[in-house]
Amino acid sequence: MDQQPLAHPQQRPPPSLKNPRFTLELEFVSSLANPYYLSHLAVTYPNLLGISKSSDDSNTGTEGPDPEAQAFAAYLAYLYSYWKTPEYAQFLTHPGATLRALRLLQEETFRRDIIRPQVIEALAGTGLEDGQGGQNVEAGDIGHNEGDQGTQQDKENIASKT
């Protein structure tokens, strides 16, 4: 499989639907708006999200972080760094939900917690996909503010539903 998006992560692909790298990354980040896709990633590729296959009792601190998890976290940070700009966000079908998911995925604790069904259901219940789940979190904290201000509010909303 072509590893081009990881080969030069500092170079943004030109925002054109004719650019294969751009369309590949657009498809990937768009899929992150779906909490059930996040669940699929957590279950199928737990190592990429820093989820240990063994229980936390083996966490003695002697092992360093998984290099694959670090690379994937860096890739997510790279994606978030440019998809949040208006030049790229205009191509997103669900920009609020997509950018919210990318922002939450910047946090190690969130990447570990998304394997729990309660967290996924809470995300689905907040309207991550369509904004109909009660409080529309993404409208207030991503629509106009590209910072990380809404992260604590997102955590509290998710925690209150679990």
UniProtKB/Swiss-Prot annotation:
A Gene Ontology term for the protein's cellular component: mediator complex
Gene source species: Neosartorya fischeri (strain ATCC 1020 / DSM 3700 / CBS 544.65 / FGSC A1164 / JCM 1740 / NRRL 181 / WB 181) (Aspergillus fischerianus)
Keyword entries, A-Z: Activator, Nucleus, Transcription, Transcription regulation
Name this protein carries in UniProt: Mediator of RNA polymerase II transcription subunit 31
Pfam family, one: Med31
An annotated GO BP: regulation of DNA-templated transcription
GO molecular function: transcription coregulator activity
Similarity comment text for this entry: Belongs to the Mediator complex subunit 31 family.
Main function: Component of the Mediator complex, a coactivator involved in the regulated transcription of nearly all RNA polymerase II-dependent genes. Mediator functions as a bridge to convey information from gene-specific regulatory proteins to the basal RNA polymerase II transcription machinery. Mediator is recruited to promoters by direct interactions with regulatory proteins and serves as a scaffold for the assembly of a functional preinitiation complex with RNA polymerase II and the general transcription factors.
Subunit note: Component of the Mediator complex.
Region (Disordered): 126-162
InterPro entries noted in UniProt: Med31_sf (IPR038089), Mediator_Med31 (IPR008831)
Biased composition (Basic and acidic residues): 141-162
Location(s) in or outside the cell: Nucleus
Gene3D superfamilies: Mediator of RNA polymerase II, submodule Med31 (Soh1) (1.10.10.1340)
Domain of life: Eukaryota
